[in-house]
C-alpha cells in the first residue's frame, strides 16, 4: 500500500505503522448477482486505532480541506469508531469539512449498532454520501427524496445520494440536481463508491460546485466499473473529461 500511494504521489509522511498487527484485507468473488466480499479484518492495524492517536494527525486534520470517513471506519472496531468520532469533532473545530460515505457492511457489525453509529456520524458531517441500498437497510426508506430529507434532518448540509445505474441525486438543502447515469459495459463494481467519493472530494477541493463535482464523480465511477478490481480500472482525468463530453453507449452502470 505504501508503495502504491507513493507512486500515486500521495503524501505518506503521517501514516502510522503497527508492527504488531496485519493490514486488513478483503476478498472479492463474482457471480450472476454481482460482487461479494469476504473480510480478514479482525485485529488489523486499522482496527487498533485509538483516539489518542489523533495527536499524531492533529496538524494534518487542521490543515486539510476535507476529512473523509466511511461506515467501515466506524465498523471495524469500537476503538476505531471512537477515533473516527473524535477526528470528526476535531475537524469541525478546525473548519475542516467532513465527508462520510455510508458504506454499510453488515458482515462487520450488527444492524442496530450500525444504525446508531452512522446516524451520529451523519450529525457530524458536512457532506453525506449514502447509497440507496444502504439507506433502505439503515432507515427503511426506499424513496430518494425521503432519504435526502432524512440526511439533512440529521445535520448533513450537503447530500449526494448514489443511485447506481441511475446516477446520483445531489442536494445542498435548498436545491437538488439529478445527475443521470452513463451507459457503459459494466463488469465489476468493486471500488466504484470509493472512486466516486475520491473524485467528488478532489473536484470540490479544486473549487468545483457540488453539481459539477457530482457530475465528474459520476462519470469517473462509471468508467471504473469497466474493469476488474478496485485500483487498476481507476480512470485518468482525461478519460473522465472525454466521457463527460461523449454520448453514452452500452448499458447503464
State what each model feature region is:
Residues 1-71, 242-250:
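Conserved N-terminal subdomain of the carbohydrate kinase-like
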Residues 3-7, 31-33, 115-118, 146-148, ...:
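Short, hinge-like loop/turn segments at secondary-structure boundaries
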Residues 10, 96, 230:
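Short glycine/serine/threonine/alanine-rich loop segments
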Residues 32, 43, 104-106, 164-166, ...:
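Glycine-rich beta-alpha junction loops
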Residues 57, 114, 118, 186:
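Acidic, amphipathic alpha-helical patches
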Residues 66-150, 166-168:
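Conserved beta-alpha-beta core of the PfkB/ribokinase-like small-molecule kinase fold
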Residues 89-90, 140-253:
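Conserved phosphate-binding/catalytic region of the ribokinase-like
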Amino acid at each position: 500500500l505504501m508503495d502504491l500511494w507513493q507512486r500515486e504521489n500521495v503524501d505518506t509522511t503521517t501514516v502510522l505503522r503497527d508492527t504488531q498487527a496485519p493490514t486488513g484485507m478483503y476478498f472479492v468473488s463474482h457471480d450472476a448477482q454481482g460482487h461479494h466480499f469476504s473480510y480478514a479484518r479482525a485485529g488489523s492495524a486499522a482496527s487498533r486505532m485509538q483516539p489518542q492517536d489523533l495527536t499524531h494527525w492533529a496538524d494534518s486534520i487542521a490543515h486539510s480541506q476535507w476529512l473523509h470517513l466511511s461506515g467501515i471506519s466506524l465498523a471495524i472496531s469500537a476503538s476505531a469508531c471512537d477515533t473516527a468520532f473524535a477526528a470528526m469533532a476535531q475537524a469541525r473545530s478546525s473548519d475542516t469539512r467532513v465527508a462520510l460515505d455510508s458504506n454499510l457492511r453488515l458482515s462487520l457489525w450488527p444492524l442496530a449498532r450500525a444504525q446508531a453509529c452512522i446516524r451520529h456520524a451523519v450529525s457530524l458531517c458536512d457532506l453525506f454520501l449514502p447509497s440507496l441500498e444502504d439507506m433502505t437497510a439503515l432507515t427503511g426508506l426506499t424513496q430518494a427524496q425521503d432519504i435526502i430529507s432524512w440526511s439533512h434532518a440529521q445535520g448533513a448540509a450537503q447530500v449526494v445520494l448514489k443511485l447506481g445505474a441511475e446516477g446520483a441525486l445531489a442536494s445542498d438543502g435548498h436545491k437538488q440536481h439529478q445527475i443521470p447515469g452513463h451507459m457503459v459495459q459494466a463488469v465489476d463494481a468493486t471500488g466504484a463508491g470509493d472512486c466516486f467519493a475520491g473524485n467528488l472530494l478532489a473536484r470540490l477541493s479544486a473549487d468545483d460546485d457540488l453539481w459539477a463535482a457530482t457530475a465528474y464523480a459520476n462519470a469517473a465511477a462509471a468508467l471504473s466499473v469497466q474493469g476488474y478490481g478496485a485500483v487498476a480500472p481507476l480512470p485518468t482525468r482525461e478519460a473522465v473529461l472525454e466521457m463527460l463530453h461523449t454520448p453514452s453507449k452500452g448499458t447503464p452502470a
